[in-house]
UniProtKB/Swiss-Prot annotation:
UniProt record, GO biological process: embryo development ending in birth or egg hatching; mitotic DNA replication checkpoint signaling; mitotic G2 DNA damage checkpoint signaling
Disruption phenotype: RNAi-mediated knockdown leads to premature cell-cycle reentry of the Z2/Z3 primordial germ cells in L1 stage larvae. RNAi-mediated knockdown and DNA damage induced by the ribonucleotide reductase inhibitor hydroxyurea in germ cells results in impaired DNA repair, but does allow for nuclear division. In the proliferative zone of these germ cells, nuclei do not arrest following DNA damage, but prematurely divide and are smaller compared to wild-type.
Tissues where the protein occurs: Expressed in the germline.
GO terms for MF: ATP binding; histone H3T11 kinase activity; protein serine kinase activity
Record localization: Cytoplasm; Nucleus; Cytoplasm, Perinuclear region
Protein kinase domain ranges (all copies): 24-286
Coiled-coil zones: none
Upper lineage: Eukaryota, Metazoa, Ecdysozoa, Nematoda, Chromadorea
Primary localisation category: cytoplasm
E.C. designation(s): 2.7.11.1
Name recorded for this polypeptide: Serine/threonine-protein kinase chk-1
Record region (Disordered): 320-346
């Protein structure tokens, strides 16, 4: 990659001055897509200064494609100018003849879908905790005249202290200019989360489509499943919800009455009756005191009723530079994760690109912690060669496509979902063959990916052991699984502080 230029763009004043790429170092790839990749980078003079770099290939691309990258940058820069704890911050942009580079805040806690257990979801206290942050972030975005149009768990990132951040503005647009709202007409988004008016190709108001998507995210958090494939007349489950005839079926029977009443106001096909952000924040379920959330970090933080929280932020971005048309769940990046380490966040691109070398042990550290947070992994008592064969066989028996990529790595696919399976020998357990099997989503819906993982895991249950967690713990890593504790709170292992969600 050559040194980036600062050729004239609509955002020329905000683009960083020319800097050689050697001033920062790529630690690892966070995600890959059809048009580029997302990289975790650090300042080579100060490796504690980190950011996510979205590297987008523009070679032989149309003017519209490049204009949409600039639009994504400008919209996210617009909301970053003031900044909000629940929205990923844009740091800057550079470009050369082959690539555009977007530099974004780095979040070290994974994607929200990592926390959603298939067919189970998560506890109501944590669902409310994350939902409140999502609503606060959406309110801020809408107040700045921007609509996101692709709200889903894969685009909601977390910090190590469970601060939720809205990311990926690749489908965002301005819905209001100088106080005058306009109707939108582009059909875009991810089908299971998209509002019916958007699926139908009608003109639509901006904010209500984000409200609808937030409701689908809440359903996924509470139940671990999506209510339908598409909000259209062709969907029996969708029509059952609209006609109020399917409440004794899944997923609705898993949801308590108070939450269901709120969802009725959010997930309604009547846009003029769909709840506003303010109405959601006043709803009894939103305001209900479920208890407190324990986090693995420093000082206690308070949640205030209907107010923006003042929580220290940290991100990663996703490879979706193009303005995508309506599609099935698409490829998104996976976060590198670090526990017990808080990266500094550069305030502008020059602060990041000041930069010697990061120790390769740092890369290994990120790789291991990435496994810990995802929880889509297990340890087996067979050697690596036989493990490889067993994983391939289990995947094939589940009806998945299996393709060898390189040594001890498999690409497993089913419909629109694909996952990469990597095997690691646990060499520090003497005289015992132990292999860590790690699954990473590379494309498609996160909840369906987890179901695929569970299917393969269940087919290999007779070889699975618990040594993997002990191995990671001995290396200084501990899986961070939220748990319900006394009084209805949520506990995270080795918690030293809490976030009070009293309202």
């Amino acid at each position: 990659m050559s040194a980036a230029s600062t050729t004239s763009t609509p955002a020329a004043a905000a683009v960083a001055p020319q800097q050689p790429e050697s001033l920062y170092r790529v630690v690892q790839t966070l995600g890959e897509g059809a048009f580029g990749e997302v990289l975790l980078i650090v300042n080579t003079k100060n490796p504690e200064v980190a950011a996510a770099m979205k590297k987008i290939n523009i070679a032989n691309k149309s003017k519209d494609f490049i204009d949409n990258i600039r639009k994504e940058y400008l919209l996210q820069k617009r909301v970053s100018a003031v900044g909000h704890d629940n929205v990923i911050r844009m740091i800057g942009m550079r470009n050369d003849p082959q690539f555009y580079y977007l530099f974004l805040e780095y979040a070290d806690g994974g994607e929200l879908f990592d926390k959603i257990e298939p067919d189970c979801g998560m506890s109501p206290v944590f669902a409310q905790f994350y939902f409140k942050q999502l609503i606060c972030g959406l309110k801020f975005i809408h107040d700045n005249d921007v609509v996101h149009r692709d709200i889903k768990p894969e685009n909601l990132l977390l910090t190590g202290t469970h601060v939720l951040k809205i990311s990926d503005f690749g489908m965002a647009t301005l819905y209001r200019n100088k106080g005058e709202e306009r109707l939108l007409d582009l059909s875009c988004g991810t089908i299971p989360y998209a509002a019916p008016e958007l699926c139908a190709g009608k003109k639509y108001r901006g904010p209500p489509v984000d409200v609808w998507s937030s409701g689908i995210v809440l359903i996924a958090m509470l139940t671990g499943e999506l209510p339908w494939d598409r909000a259209s007349d062709a969907s029996q489950s969708y029509m059952g919800w609209i006609s109020n005839t399917s409440l004794d079926e899944r997923p609705w029977k898993k949801i308590d009455v108070r939450a269901l009443c709120m969802l009725r106001k959010i997930v309604t096909d009547k846009t003029d009756k769909r709840a506003t952000i303010e109405q959601i924040q006043a709803d009894p379920w939103y305001q209900h005191n479920f208890g407190q959330v324990e986090t693995p970090n420093g000082r206690p933080l308070k949640r205030a009723r209907n107010n923006d929280e003042n929580i220290t932020c940290t991100q990663q971005a996703e490879c979706s530079a193009k303005r995508r048309h309506l599609e099935t769940p698409n490829e998104k990046s996976t976060l590198a994760e670090r526990q017990n380490a808080s990266f500094s966040q550069p305030t502008k691109t020059e602060d990041l690109l000041l930069t010697q070398h990061i120790d390769m042990s740092q890369t290994n550290s990120n790789l291991l912690q990435r496994m810990v947070c995802r929880m889509t992994r297990f340890c087996v008592v067979t050697d690596i060669r036989s493990t490889y064969q067993k994983v391939a066989r289990a995947s094939e028996h589940a009806g998945f496509g299996v393709r060898e990529t390189d040594d001890y790595r498999l690409l497993v696919t089913w419909r629109e979902v694909s996952m990469m399976v990597s095997l690691y020998t646990m060499g520090d357990i003497p005289d015992k063959p132990r292999v860590m099997v790690d699954f990473r989503r590379s494309r498609g819906d996160g909840i369906q990916f987890k179901k695929m993982f569970m299917d393969v895991r269940n087919r290999m249950h007779e070889w699975i052991c618990t040594d993997g967690n002990n191995w990671l713990a001995n290396l200084g890593y501990v899986p961070r699984n939220p748990q319900i504790v006394n009084g209805g709170g949520v506990n995270v292992e080795h918690s030293a502080s809490s976030i009070n969600v009293d309202v």
